[in-house]
UniProtKB/Swiss-Prot annotation:
Signal peptide start and end residues: none
The UniProt record lists the keyword DNA-binding: yes
Protein name: Putative HTH-type transcriptional regulatory protein SSO0942
Organism: Saccharolobus solfataricus (strain ATCC 35092 / DSM 1617 / JCM 11322 / P2) (Sulfolobus solfataricus)
Domain HTH cro/C1-type: 125-180
Coiled coil: none
PROSITE patterns: HTH_CROC1 (PS50943)
Entry keyword Transcription: yes
Length: 310
C-alpha cells in the first residue's frame, strides 16, 4: 500500500470528520478492503499505487452489490475528474477525485473500454422530455442518434458521449447530468459465483458454499478480506461468515477485523469454529459461533429457526 495515498485519504476523511475504520486483515498480503467509511451509505475503500487485481475487484464488487453501496479504488493511475468503472459498484478514482466525492461534488465523467462517457439521470431525461412535449423521435433527431438510443438512455441502460451530453444540456438543462458513483449503484443485480471448487474434506469453504446454496441461500466467496463469505437470505438479511484459520493468533485477528467489517456494512457476523479451544474463547467474547460439523444449525439460523447465540 502506498503510504502517500493512504495518508492523503485519511487526511481527507479527518478533515471532513467522517467516521471510518481501517480493516487490517490480511496483515502481510494483498487485501481487498483497506477502509470502510460510515457515511450516509457505507463505502468501501481500497488504496493502491499499482494495478488492482481481479480478485480484489471481485471482492469489492460482491460486498458493494450485496450491501447496496460503492467500492472506491483510490489510485494515482486515474485522472482528477474521471472515474474508471471497474465492475458493478466498483469505481477507480484519483486522490483529488476522492476529495471531491467526500466534499459532495458531482463526478460525471467516466471511462470504460469503449471510451469516455457522461453519466445522465435517466428519470430526469424522461420526465423533462414528456413535460416539454417532445416525442422520442423528436429528441433522437435533435441529438442525431437513433430512437433506440433514446430508449436506452431513458431506461438507464446507456450513457452519452460528450457531444450528445452538450446537446442534452442545451435542450433540458444541466440537472440532467448525474453522478457516476451515486447514480450508478446497482442494488438488485444478482451476482453469480464464479468457479466454486467441488467440495472435499480438505476444502471446507467450498463445502459450506455448496450446502448454503443447496438450502436456497445466496452465498458469495470472498478471498482477500477478513470475511470468507457473504450470505443473504430470502428477506435480504446479510451475514458475513468467517472461518477459523489454523493459526490461533491470525484467527483472532481475522475475527476482530471481520466484526468491524460487519458492523460498518450493517451485516451480522457468524464465525465457524474448527477447534474446541477457539469455541470457548469466541463464546466468551460474545461472537455468534457454529462448529464446522454443525452447518445445518447455521443454515437454520440464517433461515430463521433454531439458531443459538454464542
Amino acid at each position: 500500500m502506498s503510504k502517500k495515498i493512504i495518508d492523503e485519504v485519511i487526511d481527507i476523511l479527518e478533515d471532513k470528520k467522517y467516521t471510518y475504520t481501517m480493516i487490517e486483515y490480511p496483515e502481510h498480503n494483498r487485501k481487498s478492503v483497506d477502509i470502510v467509511l460510515n457515511s450516509k451509505e457505507p463505502t468501501l475503500i481500497r488504496v493502491s499505487e499499482d494495478k488492482i487485481t481481479k480478485e480484489e475487484i471481485s471482492d469489492l464488487k460482491k460486498i458493494a452489490v450485496s450491501t447496496l453501496t460503492a467500492s472506491l479504488v483510490v489510485t494515482n493511475e486515474e485522472e482528477e475528474d474521471i472515474v474508471s468503472v471497474k465492475a458493478d459498484n466498483v469505481f477507480a478514482i484519483s486522490p483529488e477525485g476522492f476529495k471531491k466525492v467526500i466534499n459532495g461534488e458531482k463526478i460525471f465523467l467516466y471511462r470504460t473500454r469503449g471510451g469516455i462517457f457522461i453519466k445522465i439521470r435517466n428519470y430526469i431525461l424522461k420526465h423533462k422530455r414528456e413535460e416539454m412535449g417532445y416525442s422520442i423521435g423528436d429528441v433522437a433527431k435533435f441529438l442525431g442518434v437513433s430512437r433506440k438510443a433514446i430508449y436506452d438512455y431513458e431506461k438507464g441502460d446507456s450513457d452519452v458521449s460528450l457531444e450528445v451530453a452538450e446537446k442534452l444540456i442545451d435542450l433540458f438543462g444541466d440537472d440532467i447530468i448525474g453522478d457516476v458513483i451515486w447514480d450508478s449503484i446497482k442494488s438488485k443485480k444478482e451476482i453469480l459465483e464464479e468457479g466454486v471448487a467441488e467440495f472435499s474434506p480438505e476444502n471446507f469453504k467450498a463445502k459450506l458454499i455448496y450446502k448454503l446454496k443447496e438450502s436456497g441461500l445466496n452465498a458469495l466467496s470472498l478471498k482477500l478480506t477478513a470475511a470468507d463469505l457473504i450470505v443473504k437470505d430470502s428477506d435480504n438479511n446479510r451475514y458475513l461468515v468467517t472461518i477459523e484459520n489454523k493459526d490461533y493468533n491470525k484467527s483472532m485477528k481475522k475475527f476482530y477485523e471481520a466484526k468491524k467489517l460487519a458492523s460498518y456494512t450493517k451485516s451480522e457476523l457468524v464465525i465457524i469454529i474448527r477447534t474446541s479451544k477457539m469455541l470457548k474463547e469466541c463464546e466468551d467474547l460474545g461472537y455468534k459461533t457454529y462448529e464446522e460439523n454443525d452447518i445445518h444449525s447455521l443454515i437454520d439460523e440464517i433461515k430463521g429457526s433454531n439458531g443459538r447465540q454464542g
